[in-house]
């Protein structure tokens, strides 16, 4: 959520920056109308309440003196009705303004490339050499099915499309990656491990920006009005909702493993085979709470921490600086890390690393004090995948495949695989 005072005094500047996102700003223009009416109603209500208090004192004096106060009493009844009507209108206007503020996306950072679509994203850097195969490489779903380590067909029978059973060495590989990533981020990168709830309430989904705009993308448990988490970012960020932190606590860095659940409502017909786009998948998420002046340095570190996973796995990748039209709703600046997938003949996203500045913290009311009695300020929040496990499995299967259909296990994972070197 944007700062309403900043928006009020910089309306045209904010509007121009949001236009770089390619957003529909039809409702945005209502801000000035609603904000002005809200302030008018506040003034009118306070004036009437002040008058009511004054006249109430006059009525008390008249009654003590046993004088006629009927005319003033009638006047106060009218004032009371007016106050009631104004309060009702004010409540409606404030609800409309709140809904509008929750629907306005974050302002892009000045360093984000200006553009409209993913075609305008900029390659920031690449790492590793794309492997040239002496044979036609197979897609990971064929490799895994032939090896008996993934079962999409039975998962479809048990649940439906976009689900999978991991079996044998496939399940062990998934578990190995989770442990490897958590060990790396906690032991070497300084994150604290968190195992979060997989269900959250509506306030949590609103705090991180999934609601109200993207409710159709979420799995909701209607009986409780809970949501299955689309990412550990939601519960972990909301750990500190409605809290005031001390500056000495910052930066806070969490690494959280969780399963993630997404309806993929807008992805019909895309990536229908394999692990790239599942309704349920595992992920290690990195979440940070930092002082505002440190957030862009922390964004660079966040991306480096996520990249380190791919470097140790020796998987070629590139880092994309996302343009203003492809930032998503909540980010001020975002890097996508994309790993090479041979069967696609291109790079595919395996991590998004974002700086939300105070956007989420304002929605979730997460603040800190620089001094013990100082005025609370909003923290800046960041998060990034470190990494998406299923897509990492897909990248390993395809990049490490041999002509006979076996898979060489990356050296760094072998201690987690019981010393095994090959999946066959």
Swiss-Prot record:
Any idea which positions bind L-serine? 231-233, 285, 385
Q: InterPro entries, alphabetically?
A: aa-tRNA-synt_IIb, aa-tRNA-synth_II, aa-tRNA-synth_II/BPL/LPL, Ser-tRNA-ligase_type_1, Ser-tRNA-synth_1_N, SerRS_1_N_sf, SerRS_core, tRNA-bd_arm
Q: In which pathway does it act?
A: Aminoacyl-tRNA biosynthesis; selenocysteinyl-tRNA(Sec) biosynthesis; L-seryl-tRNA(Sec) from L-serine and tRNA(Sec): step 1/1
Query: What biological processes does GO assign it?
Result: selenocysteine biosynthetic process; seryl-tRNA aminoacylation
Query: What are the entry keywords?
Result: Aminoacyl-tRNA synthetase, ATP-binding, Cytoplasm, Ligase, Nucleotide-binding, Protein biosynthesis
Amino-acid positions noted as binding ATP in the UniProt annotation, renumbered to this chain: 262-264, 349-352
Q: Which SUPFAM superfamilies would you find in this protein's record?
A: Class II aaRS and biotin synthetases, tRNA-binding arm
Q: Which positions are tagged coiled coil?
A: none
MF terms in GO: ATP binding; catalytic activity, acting on a protein; serine-tRNA ligase activity; transferase activity
Of the GO CC terms on this record, one is: cytoplasm
Intracellular or extracellular location(s): Cytoplasm
Leading EC class: ligase
Domain of life, per UniProt, equals: Bacteria
Which reaction is catalysed here?
A: tRNA(Ser) + L-serine + ATP = L-seryl-tRNA(Ser) + AMP + diphosphate + H(+); tRNA(Sec) + L-serine + ATP = L-seryl-tRNA(Sec) + AMP + diphosphate + H(+)
**E.C. numbers:** 6.1.1.11
Any Pfam family the entry gives: tRNA-synt_2b
Task: Read off the domain note.
Answer: Consists of two distinct domains, a catalytic core and a N-terminal extension that is involved in tRNA binding.
Q: Which NCBIfam families match?
A: serS
Listed under subunit, the entry gives: Homodimer. The tRNA molecule binds across the dimer.
Q: Which family does it belong to?
A: Belongs to the class-II aminoacyl-tRNA synthetase family. Type-1 seryl-tRNA synthetase subfamily.
Function noted in UniProt: Catalyzes the attachment of serine to tRNA(Ser). Is also able to aminoacylate tRNA(Sec) with serine, to form the misacylated tRNA L-seryl-tRNA(Sec), which will be further converted into selenocysteinyl-tRNA(Sec).
List the protein's name: Serine--tRNA ligase
